[in-house]
Amino acid sequence: SVWIKKLLNENKLRYNSHLYSESNQSLRKIPQTELEYSNEKKDVDARIILRDNFDKLLSKYPELIIFGEDCGKIGDVNQGLEGLQEKHGEHRVFDTGIREATIIGQGIGLALRGLRPIAEIQYLDYLLYAIQILSDDLATLQYRTFGGQKAPLIIRTRGHRLEGIWHSGSPMG
């Protein structure tokens, strides 16, 4: 009918745009950087590499915060954040309770307010406890608000340890 066609045309833009970021921070607009490798070989624990990189990021970006279970005091379960709470303060690197859905919800709220949060979920198999918030809230926010809001949240986790039934699972198969 004419009425349906008119309605479809009127709402085409609203329902078919802003599915992906169109901002300057879009992955499609970030220039690619070529990898550079040193000829010098040096064995370093991965946790040290991670810690040093997070340290540099926290120093460079005052709006960056890292939080999750055991992130603050002990520097995460594998010490990839070791000493960073002492160095950067307990408002930038801090612990949360053991509720993955709450951690993701906090991250969304912080991102909506202009901060750049890194929400740590201890193990990959625990993401399932936050899947509804990830799929219904975080993943669709920009689309649902017609590009009016975005929540640039980084979720950090680990998995595939293959050490028994706990902390080794993966929703990826």
Residue ranges and their predicted role:
Residues 1-173:
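Thiamine diphosphate
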